[in-house]
Amino acid sequence: MRKFLVIMDNSPEFLNALRFAAIRASKTGGAVEILGIIGPEEFQHWLGVGEAMRAEARERIEAHFKVFSKWMEEKEGLTPELVIREGERATEVLAQIKEDPEVGILVLGANPSGEGPGPLVSQLVGRQGGVLPVPVTIVP
């Protein structure tokens, strides 16, 4: 089954990408995988504090996922999958695509300012020399 991979964050672009992925997956018999990434800046503190911050970040991602999962189940009849990774965003996106062969499309929201494709798209394309392992859909 082909999965649409969406990167979770707090931006309006994420919501647009998620909505698009849910509709496309529903219409094509696919699935949606939501990737939450805990950035290195969130847990590079003293050991005890860093662990507490990591746990809080994971809980925050899981709480957001529950909201989006409920919406997706009610609107599109899909149950999305949550994956949580730790590290630099572009690196973790590429690692997830490589580790999950069912990921067929990366869905990202466009930069709302209209000034370039956005930081994650720029990082991914720059790192891969313009060649990504899966097609990318950028949702306006």
Where are these regions (language model features)?
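Generic structural signal for helix capping and beta-alpha/helix-loop junctions
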Residues: 41-42, 90, 115
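General small-molecule cofactor/ligand-binding pocket signal
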Residues: 33-35, 81-85, 137-139
